[in-house]
UniProtKB/Swiss-Prot annotation:
Signal peptide: none
InterPro entries: A_thaliana_F-box, F-box-assoc_dom_typ1, F-box-assoc_interact_dom, F-box-like_dom_sf, F-box_dom
Superkingdom, natural source: Eukaryota
Lineage: Eukaryota, Viridiplantae, Streptophyta, Embryophyta, Tracheophyta
One Pfam family recorded for the sequence: FBA_1
Protein name: Probable F-box protein At3g44130
Amino acid sequence: MASGNLPWELEEEILCRLPLGSLVRLRSVCKHWNDFFNDKWFIKKSLGCARPQFIILPESKIYSIGTIGLDGVDPKIEVRELACQFHFEAEKWAFTAACDGLLFRDFWNQGVTIWNPWLRQVGWIEYKENRDFRFCGVGYDAGKPEKGYKIFGYFNRFYDTKLKIDHRFAIFECASQAVKFIDSPEWPMLAGRGEYVSLNGNLYWTAYNEETREHFLGSFNFSTEISMRFCLLPCAKHVSGLRDKLVLTVFKGDRFALLKQSRISKDTKVLTAQYGPKARTKKNENAEKACLKSYGSLKPDRLEKLKKSMKRY
């Protein structure tokens, strides 16, 4: 039977929809397929089609947790151990961050590893003379054609006379390993205490205003090096001081999802954004509380049943 060649465009469309693990194994088929891994458009589209997975880091091993057959009658959870080429002690690292499919891991007072889980490539950034630098998150200047990753963090400043600790925020450029300090009077209010999430090169985090008792999303733009409040969060003002527990993540590749749990009632809700940062217009910039809307909720009794089922698994 005669065989024919598919158009390159059709091959790209098929390959970008394959699972990343299978796609890596196809690099050796031909030079053109291997070149896809250096094509920014192909990488972006492939990551956009990929099903999100969890990465867990127990002690010295790394695992990925994915779902198989969610659309069928017999969905399964797949747990895979991922090979890593670096060794660490669990107590020596503090933070992790993801950006463009890369995993950044901070080793306290030592440096940061940049790890591509699927290509099994590991890079190391050493802090050298800046060992007191505290890692927060990763981003890049979205206005430039080439992505130069930058680490957002801070240095502790100690005041001996009053025994107070202050933070001085800075940007650590991965390529040049240069540190640039950022001074702003808004930092005490805008600095978040939770995890920082990277989206379109910018950083976002949940923060809290002690004076107004309002939760909101803070943001940092690596292009302008300006921090600002992105939107208010629909959280109750608790006079008791017990704040809602918040977990922020990226949803559908271009917007946010927020898991919110009340520390009083233990009710858990999932909120999703109708639009992403790029889609914000002058019309909806003022409608801050409409930024995130409820997607679903989970009562404490159902959450307890879910925990028990997870323990059995």
